[in-house]
């Protein structure tokens, strides 16, 4: 992902304030609620029968944190996202058979959740930088798909 120095600084500064567990759980939960077909990949998570069940599900929260921990790792390697996410791409492609479009959807949901959490601090410039990052991560995660 090509970010200007200013964009990298904005992404890094905001990310330092992100509560990964809270934001990750909310982002994954919102994905599962807004795009219910994505729930099929999470059969082992138990009750996903309603928005409140999804949003309060401890397995959703835990996996959301795991997702954002990986995203955090990606932020450390913006110039080599394909390499950073190669194993996860392979896992999601070959073993889990996740539609790569879901990565884009989750990235967009994450941007919305960040905007909700940070309000005025999430300026149009910060949003634009994050849109570049989530698009780059989605592309990297889709890399192993044929």
Curated annotation (Swiss-Prot):
Residues bearing PTM N-acetylvaline: 1
Keyword Metal-binding attributed: yes
PTM-bearing positions, type S-nitrosocysteine: 93
Residue positions binding heme b: 63, 92
InterPro entries referenced in this protein's UniProt entry, alphabetically: Globin, Globin-like_sf, Globin/Proto, Hemoglobin_b, Hemoglobin_oxygen_transport
Residues carrying N6-acetyllysine: 59, 82, 144
Assembly with partners or alone: Heterotetramer of two alpha chains and two beta chains.
Protein name per its UniProtKB record: Hemoglobin subunit beta
Organism: Rousettus aegyptiacus
């Amino acid at each position: 992902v090509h970010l200007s120095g200013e964009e990298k600084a904005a992404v890094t500064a905001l990310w330092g304030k992100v509560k990964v567990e809270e934001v990750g759980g909310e982002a994954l939960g919102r994905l599962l609620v807004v795009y219910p077909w994505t729930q099929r990949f999470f059969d082992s998570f138990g009750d996903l029968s309603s928005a409140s069940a999804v949003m309060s599900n401890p397995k959703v929260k835990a996996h959301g944190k795991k997702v954002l921990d990986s995203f955090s790792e990606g932020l450390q390697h913006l110039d080599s996202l394909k390499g950073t996410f190669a194993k996860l791409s392979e896992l999601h492609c070959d073993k889990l058979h996740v539609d790569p479009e879901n990565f884009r959807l989750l990235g967009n949901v994450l941007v919305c959740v960040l905007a909700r959490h940070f309000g005025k601090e999430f300026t149009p410039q910060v949003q634009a930088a994050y849109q570049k990052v989530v698009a780059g991560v989605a592309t990297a995660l889709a890399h192993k798909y044929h």
